[in-house]
Amino acid sequence: MLYLFYYCLLSPPYYFFTSHIQDFDYENKDQEELSFVSQGNRLSGTLLTPQHKTPSAVIVVIHGDGPQDRYSNGGYNPLFNTFLDANIAIFSWDKAGIGDSQGNWLHQSMEARAEEAVAALKLMQLRYPEVQVGFLGFSQAGWVIPIAASQSQPAFSVIIGGAVNWREQGQYYQKLRYEQQGKTPDEIIQLLAKEQKENDDIFGLHGTKDRTRRNDMSEDRFNFVVKNYLSDSSSYLRKMNGRILAVWGNNDLNVNAQLNACRYRAILNTHHQADIVVFPHASHGLLRVPEFNYQLESDWPIYRQLQFLWAGRKAYTEGSLPLIIDWIKNKNPDFSPYNMDCNL
């Protein structure tokens, strides 16, 4: 991994020897290349398992937005190694059209992505009939997993940083973007209202779907938004099978954590196997705040990227991953310190 070489080259000896750089390699882990077919596309991935052990659980990873390969360009490695060290296997694949997978992820609706997820789940369930197999995903996976889990029988689903409504999530994201740009509250209100109307006129239920009005988007991206602009997970959340853990970071810059946690709680209030958790001092991806709290991968300065390489799994907010692991393993962790007060 070239970035590891440069990191070692540039780092003083103290930082190198105190780092968690080993979290980015899969030494002493078994790796098996696997492929499966969904909607006519052959999708390629890797099954990662603890060496010489039968896993206690298998996670089927559902990516967020963007052209992600099976390891999210190496960003998933510390997370995956943490699960593997806890005897939890990982199956992750390149999104359609990325790496060795056929197709084009920008041609997919959330329903199409869910169909893909179900195919992967069934593949793992056939391989491990005596082991609990479930979903885990970030961000956009919050629209994919509820559909998939309502159309299959996962043992569990872990949704991290999910939003219920696509349209509202876009407004929240853009609001924070404008705040970072230094715009005034009045300017932001006006800009958001204008953008909402324009987007509804184009992408809404009765929208024009006129691409000439959004020349800032590629044709593929435009059509992707057309397919998914009205996505709302409410009805699917109610029909999900298996245990549910919905998790947010309280300092999420992409999704309104408080609003969506309370919506999940209201929707799943009759689901006795649902846990709703908001971790303090945590980002959209449960990374530590303020060090690793950015909206986009492209926002990360070089020194933060190097710091992430040094931190490895320690980049995640303290206690978050052990609690998720204990939950997956049915150890009934105490989430009470992380419950949202939705009565405020």
Language-model-detected regions and their locations in the chain:
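Short beta-strand/loop motif that positions the catalytic acidic residue
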Residues: 240, 246-248
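Short alpha-helix in the alpha/beta-hydrolase fold that links the catalytic acid
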Residues: 242, 253-267, 291
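Conserved alpha/beta-hydrolase
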Residues: 80-100
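Short beta-strand element of the alpha/beta-hydrolase
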Residues: 55-64
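Alpha/beta-hydrolase active-site loop
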Residues: 107-127
